[in-house]
Design a protein with these regions (language model features):
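Acidic donor-binding loop of glycosyltransferase active sites
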Residues: 280-298, 311
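Short hydrophobic beta-strand element within catalytic cores of glycosyltransferases
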Residues: 312-315, 331-332
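Extended catalytic core of nucleotide-activated donor transferases of GT-like folds
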Residues: 7-9, 46-133
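Short glycine/serine-rich donor-binding loops of glycosyltransferases
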Residues: 300-303, 318
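N-terminal pre-catalytic "stem/leader" segment of glycosyltransferase-like enzymes
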Residues: 1-75, 230, 400, 405
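C-terminal amphipathic helix plus adjacent low-complexity
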Residues: 237, 342, 346-431
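Conserved catalytic-core segment of nucleotide-activated headgroup transferases in glycan assembly
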Residues: 21-23, 27-28, 164-277
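Donor nucleotide-sugar binding/catalytic pocket of nucleotide-sugar-dependent glycosyltransferases
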Residues: 119-179
Length: 431
């Protein structure tokens, strides 16, 4: 019996969050060996292309599965990994996979796109919130209200599982002496907070990742301290380049100039690095905790991956990462849900009417101080969080969930069994 024909349209070969998500979904489908999987490779904004490595057997298999844009036959299952307004219905059964939008409202085109599909899979509860929360008035050509546009398609959660083979705890003595590890060794501070994320558009305290506010809060918290910790930032504003690196340094310097006093050190890691280097960074003994004062996450993948180091996390108490950052073990910063700033409004993505989270910077400051002064207790919580996430949010658990969803919804191939026909002998005609 032939396998169901599954086509996945996704940014499989890009250096992007959606690219990582796409590779995970395709890897899970291929490992299940239940489907004939083909891929329509897409670009993702201005992110770099060419991630797939032919020397990696699984990635070579993905590359070999890429087909031309013109489909020769209708897929049994069409899966599109993208933002909802790009969703198309091309298969017998159609699944849209999305991280949604980080605010509380989405554009009407997102809802219309989602309603073209048979099933929507969100990365987290928050990733589906805006789709479910947004309702638009539908009008006829004369402008008369005739109904409402709202989400009609069934939904489910397919979280982004951490790859336990790529991210795992390493004892300091076992860290390889790579260029990155040796650079981290030279940091004079023994205690460093780590931030991982893009520095996105917006005024200080208004960009989605809240990178500017984090820098300012860190500097204000530890200025003039005799023994201050460091802040290590793995960040970019766009594609890796010397110009972008200079732009990030310029932003940091501008914030430093706004804070008076003797200031703590900030170290920048810029550009794309291998997963193995990221794991070494997470496990380096000078990195004590991850911090992220984000205004909103569809999921928050680096936060989950960092849990494998068994170190504690400080993060905003809102949006996608709350699915896996158990409040018993993570340090969650309170705040308010407030309207987005005009400096971050983007057509179809971040609406001027929408809201997202404003974490309490003074509370974050107190937490950072307490981490430095009373680290042992937080270290214990980090270990418990690591166990919780390993048991509940691994790649294998994600694959199990995806297979269950596919088994339930994918059209089944019907095997036609012919009845056994008894062979008979006809009597010979007499001559």
């Amino acid at each position: 019996m032939s396998k169901p024909f599954v086509v996945v349209s996704c940014p499989i070969d890009t250096y992007s969050g959606y690219g990582s998500r796409a590779r995970d979904v395709v890897r899970a489908l291929m490992r299940s060996d239940k489907y004939d999987v083909k891929i329509l490779s897409q670009r993702w904004g201005n992110t770099p292309y060419g991630f797939l490595n032919e020397n990696n057997p699984e990635e070579k298999k993905m590359k070999d599965a890429i087909i031309p844009p013109q489909l020769q036959r209708q897929p049994d299952v069409w899966i599109q990994i993208s933002v909802p307004d790009e969703f198309q219905k091309l298969g017998k059964f159609n699944i849209g996979i999305t991280a949604g939008i980080e605010t509380d409202l989405c554009d009407v085109r997102f809802i219309q796109g989602a309603n073209r599909m048979d099933l929507i899979l969100g990365s987290s509860n928050h990733s589906l919130y805006a789709l479910k929360n947004s309702v638009y008035e539908q009008k006829d050509k004369a402008g008369k209200a005739v109904g409402h546009i709202k989400l009609e398609t069934p939904t489910d959660i397919l979280f982004e599982g951490v790859d336990l083979e790529k991210y795992f705890p390493i004892e300091p003595k076992d860290l390889p002496k790579t260029e990155l590890v040796q650079s981290l060794d030279t940091i004079e501070e023994d205690f460093s907070f780590l931030y991982v994320g893009h520095w996105l558009r917006g005024a200080i305290g208004e960009d989605r990742k809240n990178t500017g506010l984090l820098v300012k809060t860190f500097l204000e918290t530890f200025k003039n301290k005799k023994k201050a910790p460091a802040l290590i930032m793995k960040t970019m504003t766009g594609p890796a380049s010397i110009m972008d690196r200079n732009e990030v340094l310029k932003k940091i310097d501008a914030i430093r100039k706004s804070v008076q006093g003797r200031l703590p050190n900030i170290y920048l890691i810029h550009g794309d690095i291998e997963d193995s280097d990221v794991n070494h960074l997470y496990n380096h003994p000078k990195v004590k905790a991850m911090i992220n004062l984000t205004k909103g996450e569809g999921f928050g993948r680096p936060l989950l991956e960092f849990t494998r180091s068994k170190k504690p996390i400080i993060a905003s108490n809102w949006s996608g990462h709350l699915d896996f950052l158990n409040k018993e073990f993570a340090s969650l910063v309170p705040g308010e849900v407030k309207p987005v700033h005009e400096s971050v409004v983007q057509d179809r993505l971040i609406l001027k009417e929408s809201k997202w989270f404003a974490p309490d910077a003074s509370f974050a400051s107190l937490l950072m101080k307490d981490y430095v002064n009373s680290y042992k207790g937080y270290e214990t919580k980090g270990k418990r969080l690591a166990h919780y996430c390993k048991e509940n949010f691994s790649f294998e658990k994600m694959q199990e969930k995806l297979e269950a969803i596919m088994d339930k919804n994918a059209p089944k191939k019907v095997e036609i069994k012919l009845p056994n026909i008894k062979k008979i002998s006809l009597p010979k005609k007499d001559d």
